[in-house]
Amino acid sequence: MIGLSEIELAGIAGAYFLGSLSSAIIVCRLMGLGDPRQEGSGNPGATNVKRLYGSKPAAITLLGDMLKGVVPVALANMAGWSPLAIILVGFASFIGHLYPIFFGFRGGKGVATMLGVMFGLSLPIGAAVAGTWLFVAKVLKISSLSALIATALAPLYIYLLADGNMAWVSVTAIMTLILFWRHRSNIERLLKGEEDLIKKQPGASDPKE
């Protein structure tokens, strides 16, 4: 397959299965909480978990989702795999998070896992994307918009910080398009001025993300 070795293909498949381990569902089960797919927005991600159950399970969920992107990509990087194989490992983990085989192919929206992939590619790339995410979130206080802007800029950051590695740029651009598609309801609310702010009043329950 397009010049990939058997071990690289196996690694890509393994990354998909790793990505399919839904941090939100697993964390909530271990902590005796509800199923985030059945409550709030129905999205098994850190934002919904935070709104439903608080900061601690949300932080663990966020870390777990990021590690699903960081670990396989960093390992492929350290193993000296081809640039295409490295980014396809990240893509597979990202797709696993969105469409997990272990949870009925109903996964999250992919922001944290994509951010983890960026850190796995290189620390400067990850820092650039994360920095953009945090800066926009602080200024605009809209979680979905900060994620969309940060991931939209990810291909540009890779081009500038990875010597124009077009395999990484191209696959990351595809990931960004998929992520935008997964956020289409958020985008509709943004255009209507109805999207939730990050900081909500205690007890508020407008589960839209």
From Swiss-Prot:
It comes from Hydrogenovibrio crunogenus (strain DSM 25203 / XCL-2) (Thiomicrospira crunogena). Its EC number is 2.3.1.275. This is Glycerol-3-phosphate acyltransferase. The keyword DNA repair does not apply. One of its GO terms (biological process) is phospholipid biosynthetic process. InterPro entries: G3P_acylTferase_PlsY (IPR003811). The chain crosses the membrane at residues 7-27, 85-105, 117-137, 142-162, 166-183. Catalyzes the transfer of an acyl group from acyl-phosphate (acyl-PO(4)) to glycerol-3-phosphate (G3P) to form lysophosphatidic acid (LPA). This enzyme utilizes acyl-phosphate as fatty acyl donor, but not acyl-CoA or acyl-ACP. Belongs to the PlsY family. It is a multi-pass membrane protein. GO terms for molecular function: acyl-phosphate glycerol-3-phosphate acyltransferase activity.
